[in-house]
Curated annotation (Swiss-Prot):
GO terms for molecular function: ATP binding; sulfate adenylyltransferase (ATP) activity. It catalyses: sulfate + ATP + H(+) = adenosine 5'-phosphosulfate + diphosphate. It comes from the Bacteria. It is an enzyme of class 2 (transferase). It comes from Cronobacter sakazakii (strain ATCC BAA-894) (Enterobacter sakazakii). Pathway: Sulfur metabolism; hydrogen sulfide biosynthesis; sulfite from sulfate: step 1/3. Its EC number is 2.7.7.4. The lineage of its organism: Bacteria, Pseudomonadati, Pseudomonadota, Gammaproteobacteria, Enterobacterales. InterPro entries: PAPS_reduct_dom, Rossmann-like_a/b/a_fold, SO4_adenylTrfase_ssu, Sulfate_adenylyltrnsfr_sub2. One of its GO terms (biological process) is sulfate assimilation. Belongs to the PAPS reductase family. CysD subfamily. With CysN forms the ATP sulfurylase (ATPS) that catalyzes the adenylation of sulfate producing adenosine 5'-phosphosulfate (APS) and diphosphate, the first enzymatic step in sulfur assimilation pathway. APS synthesis involves the formation of a high-energy phosphoric-sulfuric acid anhydride bond driven by GTP hydrolysis by CysN coupled to ATP hydrolysis by CysD. This is Sulfate adenylyltransferase subunit 2.
């Protein structure tokens, strides 16, 4: 990695650490959202650097849908234990009672009940006034126009017309009772930055990001890795072993894999350099309705 690139990554690192420390100093009860993906791994690594040699002054929160990959759950528990982090796990009890299923109820309803409502329940339950998230501006168009400090009203809704200026890295965290801020320390990072930083810092990631032969079903143009037996095959469908990896991770029925032979971090980085598609092209929730992500964020989604 050349010196110019290394300096760029260190600048991003310094900015993110500054934001994390600013939030810890400014807010009474912050929390770090932990979705187990590569961005969460980088954000957690930066937070540990920000307060080293001390422990994190806030807990991790995972809003569980019950449909994550098994390797993600194993990685989550192992990571929290290894770093001595307080891990809070919340699953929407109403969604569980209703038996919400992405295959039966569809991605939009599944996401709304198990993710959006589940997140709002958790934030209300613990009274968090600031929540870190690993979203980046290069991921998706609605995230591209969102500030680092994303103001949410007492119903956790986001109004893109009601955003605060952030001139010269000055952030306005003043809120009224019941309101909160979502904070995105990785806003200015790109997918390539993330992978190069993971390589530079030797950050552990979920093995699903690396190519391997996995059981895959092709449905509606998406390569779905079959992670358990909660699926009914349609006529003519067949599960076949294919060399795939994931660029983004979520609920396994709603997250498409990509065909790839990249089995190491340098190979992933090389793949990123020639990629012309978004990493979220395989996320069903981003295209289940017009303006999908912005609509979800207006309703309280991250």
């Amino acid at each position: 990695m050349d010196q110019k690139r290394l300096t760029h990554l260190r600048q991003l690192e310094a900015e993110s650490i500054h934001i994390i420390r600013e939030v810890a100093a400014e807010f009474a009860n912050p929390v770090m959202m932990y979705s187990i993906g590569k961005d969460s791994s980088v954000m957690l690594h930066l937070a540990r650097k920000a307060f080293y040699p001390g422990t994190l002054p806030f807990p991790l929160l995972h809003v569980d849908t019950g449909w994550k990959f098994r390797e993600m759950y194993e990685f989550r528990d192992r990571t929290a234990k290894a770093y001595g982090c307080e891990l809070l796990v919340h699953k929407n009890p109403e969604g569980v009672a209703m038996g919400i299923n992405p295959f039966v109820h569809g991605s939009a309803k599944h996401t709304d009940i198990m993710k959006t409502e589940g997140l709002k329940q958790a934030l209300n339950k613990y009274g968090f006034d600031a929540a870190f998230g690993g979203a980046r501006r290069d991921e998706e168009k609605s995230r591209a126009k969102e500030r680092i400090y994303s103001f949410r009203d007492r119903f956790h809704r986001w109004d893109p017309k009601n955003q605060r200026p952030e001139l010269w890295h000055n952030y306005n965290g003043q809120i009224n009772k019941g309101e909160s801020i979502r904070v995105f320390p990785l806003s200015n990072w790109t997918e390539l930055d993330i992978w190069q930083y993971i390589y530079l810092e030797n950050i552990e990631i979920v093995p699903l990001y690396l190519a391997a032969e996995r059981p895959v079903l092709e449905r509606d143009g998406m390569l779905m890795m079959i992670d358990d037996d909660r699926i009914d095959l349609q006529p003519g469908e067949e599960i076949k072993p294919r060399m795939v990896r994931f660029r983004t991770l979520g609920c396994w029925p709603l997250t498409g894999a990509v065909e790839s032979n990249a089995q190491t971090l340098p190979e992933i980085i090389e793949e990123m350099l020639v990629s012309t598609t978004s990493e979220r092209q395989g996320r069903v929730i981003d295209r289940d309705q017009a303006g999908s992500m912005e609509l979800k964020k207006r309703q309280g989604y991250f």
